[in-house]
Amino acid sequence: MSSDTEIRLAGEVRRRRTFAIISHPDAGKTTLTEKLLLFSGAIQIAGSVKARKATRHATSDWMEIEKQRGISVASSVMQMEYRDCVINLLDTPGHQDFSEDTYRVLTAVDAALMVIDAANGVEPQTRRLLQVCRARNTPILTFVNKMDREVKAPLDLFDEIERELGMSIVPFTWPVGMGKFFGGVLDLRRDQMRVFSPGEDRVKEGGDEVVEGLQNPALAERFGSPYMEAASEVELVREAAPGFDEAEFLAGRQTPMLFGSAINNFGVQEVLDALVELAPPPGAKAALQREVQPVEPKFSGVVFKIQANMDPAHRDRIAFLRVASGRFERGMRLKVARSGKELRPNTVVTFMSQRRELLDEAYAGDIIGIPNHGVLQLGDTLSEGESLQFTGLPFFAPEMFRSVEVADPLKTKQLRAGLTQLGEEGAIQVFRPVAGTVLLLGAVGQLQFEVVAHRLEHEYGVKARVMPARYNVARWVTCDDAKELQRFIDGNAHRVALDAVDAPTVLLEYAGELRAMQDNWPKIQFHALREHAGLVFQKQLQG
């Protein structure tokens, strides 16, 4: 590779910022996503979730069931440019039932933006998602939303977030008042106050009104006691909080905090600026064979998500791939490491929610979509020839089970085809019992079953009966001795099923049954997690 090409590749990688937005449901995550697109110039008008009964819907909530219920259940991917940076934004499912899909999305990003509802503080889903980020040392920015409502006192929020999340907080902005007395925010880094005024769908010309100097006497005159209170709180916080430390932030131990109101376009530009200035460009990615650097000349990437029916008119499946290294070019020869098959993708797309545009090139950090007809699976690595297997893309053992039958026997083929596609997405797990014909669905929450039934009917024309199944525990099984594994399967055929990649799974009613089985079959390993393609994490959970 010539030095000019190397310089260009390094420059393109430096420009990339790939991050996910995480929050508890209803914290305003989808609204903030919209407004980030608005401020970057990617869209001209925001389609408010609140207006979903009218003709507009949130740009990132594209699936029919999401529009009806106002929740994000599939992760959307959007690309935009801002301040000479290419930003890849992943909007994750806000509903807790879809935490598995969210986990996989978080393996594809270099930073996370955590949205907290100022009225509710830290909520359960936020905690769970943050644990995932902390386990991966993902840098996190915090946006405290909905300051235009009656909310918790800022100091209480500060203490709660620091205590609950176990991270040190560095306030970049601090609110003046709340609810109907919300006057704006004190920008602690720029020594100015940004004045709040309710916004609409469009970005205000000229931006927010700014008053220079945090000690400016005009602020006390204009905003009275809310300003005086905020100024004294800032003094306290500055004494208690550490200064911003880039190394601590990049290690996921310190989070900058900004306040605002996404629905009113307030505080959004500051979030966008902080993401561009602070979030890291793509870093090295771990594979079983070696560590892959983003500036390596050869292309490689990993499939972290598969989505069926993004365009119902075409019954399509799109494999979402995070570029790990090199430069992608349309039509280049790529190898699927798992199967050895060659691909030459010509219709590769980039995304604006469900809108797609053909792309000619992509670099490390970019998310590209490859139309897929069963060739690609979750976790697959594509490369220019090297056999790489990127690690860290898990499946979790389901905690709820349903049997599924078709109401019309003539639609059995469509049912299996639909479940195969939906299973490939990883939003539901499909099991085929070794002894028996009734398919089983496994999920981590009830909503997943509702979504599958809805999508089978509306996308595949199959009315399915989803009924309770007697199972409550699932474990993937492996054994170093192939004959012993087969003996186990034969001896427990009524309790063993095969998943989407034919990985044998034992399905049980009670945790006690699992303990007894572990005692009776000491050579068999039971796993609550597995990597894609049947490769199981070497992690045994007790019970």
Describe the residue ranges of each PLM region.
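Structural and coupling elements of P-loop NTPases
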Residues: M1-G543
